[in-house]
């Protein structure tokens, strides 16, 4: 068996060259905010219809999950299977417990995307203000804290499995920004660690949703498709969009 070494990994070691996109759901207006739970079930929002979140199980079945929601732009499971939800148009972050009980966590913000650490620390991006925020979910009274400013149009946020590194994609710029998460939950060591490939000079990267696998390979959706980077920030390859004229 091939050893589990991620550094300098070409895409062909992760995805077979003859792999093709498979349709798992249809009839949506605009899909956003995908995430998975601890069992590997896949969730996404049909933001264009403002309906319930959709859950895709291992057998490929697609079911509605929870109540109808307005303007969902980010999803992430936290502790105790709680699903945290960015609702930018509704100006709040909500939490869905057990798939039915919905509560507001933070109001009067315009969250685009979020992550939650294993010790209940929530980070989210607010694209319009170019900010990254932190909220300690363990506190009874939730306090907003600005932990970064200045990324041109922050659009996606990700977290490494060890909760030590946070990274943010930029819709306009090609740089993906990386931070170290300190013990006091602040962000330090900000650096443009990886660069997205763009369609042509001076065009936006359309960097969006981010994720990372167990070997710290980074995945960022973009204008060209899903771009994969190894732990050093080197591009391993691009999974092209199923529609070459549209971003992922």
Tell what function each PLM region has.
Residues 4-20, 135, 187:
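Blade/loop signatures of beta-propeller domains
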Residues 20-26, 60-66, 100-106, 142-148, ...:
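A short beta-strand motif characteristic of beta-propeller blades
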Residues 26-39, 68-87, 91-92, 107-123, ...:
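Beta-rich, blade/repeat-based domains predominating
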Residues 42-63:
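Beta-propeller domains
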Residues 47-48, 88, 127-128, 171, ...:
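Short loop/turn segments immediately following the C-termini of beta-strands
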Residues 50-54, 91-94, 130-133, 174-177, ...:
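Structural signal for beta-propeller blades
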Residues 137-138, 179-186, 233:
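Short loop/turn segments immediately following beta-strands, especially the blade-tip
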Residues 222-248:
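C-terminal closing repeat unit and adjoining cap/tail of repeat-based domains
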